[in-house]
Amino acid sequence: SEMCIRDRYELGRTYFQREDGMADEPKVLSVGGYGDGMDFFVLKGAVQSILDSIRISDAGYEAVRDNPSYHPGRCARILVDGREVGVFGQIHPLVAQNYGVDAELYCAELSFDELLNAKGPDPEYVPLPRFPAVTRDIAVVCGEKVTVGALEDCIRRGAKGLLKEVALFDIYRGKGVDEGKKSVAFNLTLRADDRSLTSEEADADVKAVLELLEQELGAVLR
């Protein structure tokens, strides 16, 4: 599923009381949604689309469990160069109920000023790829404390320059996965700039990725 950012965003100032009695008024970009087809991963995709649109290519995500406004198992902060630029996830059910809402609500809050400071350089013309991409899906089982960001970083380092995109599409806990573990699934897009990749080359790259995941993070193919 894809989220239509155009219909579900707001840009405005928020107000925070300081100890000196004055107020901070940062400008915040909020994106939200609920209903069928809306979940954590759809929202993450919307956040990533925003970052991509202003050419922020090195953002990371870190799980958050202590933000009282959000579900402790479905919340992440957005980091750019080690600085927090926003947070997103499922609104805590108790918070939603306080406003008379029973549905699962999802929201992202991004600091507009931080986004502008972090945005990348103006784009340069890049010709369309001459050669087709090869896609592979992988699902690995790892410990609960292993973050998605750590897995993504390991995948990028293991792919030897052929990886063009890595996209998280599922996190599963339950039957078939040991207690204290989780299954995390990614879609990998691989492409060479000078030739068409063979299935054998793509499989070799994925094998290298899986070996590094197991070596560094103890994550094994499901």
Task: Set out the residue ranges of the language-model regions.
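A carboxyl-terminal module marker
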Residues: R6-G12, R18-S30, G37-R222
